[in-house]
Structure formats: C-alpha cells, structure tokens
C-alpha cells in the first residue's frame, strides 16, 4: 500500500505546551481521550508503541514505532491498525505527526496522518482525529480551570 491521501486536524487548547505534551505521552491521560485505549511505550526514539483496547466489543492491539521526539514541540510515530484489514507490513503503516505550537497561554495542536489510500479513508481518519482532539481539549481545559 502506498497512499497519497493525508488526514489533518488541529485544535487550539487553553493550556501550556508542557501540559499538552504530557497528555500525548502519559498513558493515564491518553486513556481518557483516546476511546479508553491503553498506550504502552517507554517514549524514546526508536521504541515501539502499542495501543490496546476494545472497540465495539472487539479487542484490538495496534502498534507502531516512535520515530522522532522533540519534547513540547513534535512527536512522530508510525501506526498500523488491525482494523485496517491490511497485513502488518511496513508499507501499510501510517506516519502520524503531532505538532505543538505555543502561543501565549494557548497551544495549537495539529495531527497529520499520511499514507492513506482513499479520500473516504482520509475523511474518516480526519473525523476521528477531530473527535480525539476535541476530547483532549475538553480534558485539559477542565484541568486548567480547576
């Protein structure tokens, strides 16, 4: 598979980049905004990352590798999902890039996911990312206001 479509979603969060970064790399927080998913990694470049959970009654274990870490700025991972229906092989992995941009007391978080094979799949991924980012925003802004 070599997809030419990209999904992109962005959100502005009333929180410092430090807090947003923590939410991207803290398994307890990830579970709260990523559909109850358990994220397992040591968060070092070159390390694996595993996402485990149950979706619509079916257990899953998705995975990838951490390619780049720039704390409070950028996180780049590869990602493969069992739900893709594609074999677990390098050409079927997406690259997911999280970019943080601090502006005063707010952080703009942008997520891009590449190597998507169709516009329909890209639209679906973009919709999922929008939901995830809005949930993350609510979580962090609720923490910020308390």
PLM feature segments, named:
Residues 20-21, 30, 49-51, 66, ...:
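Hydrophobic pocket/interface hotspot
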Residues 25-26, 71, 141:
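Residues at helix-coil transition
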Residues 39-42, 59-104, 114:
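Hydrophobic-ligand binding "helix-grip"
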Residues 4-10, 48, 61, 74, ...:
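Intrinsic-disorder/low-complexity, polar/charged segments enriched in Ser/Thr/Lys/Arg/Asp/Glu/Gln
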Residues 1-38:
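Hydrophobic ligand-binding cavity/cleft-lining segments
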Residues 2, 108, 114-146:
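A conserved amphipathic terminal alpha-helix motif
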Residues 35, 54, 80, 112:
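Surface loops and adjacent helix of pleckstrin homology
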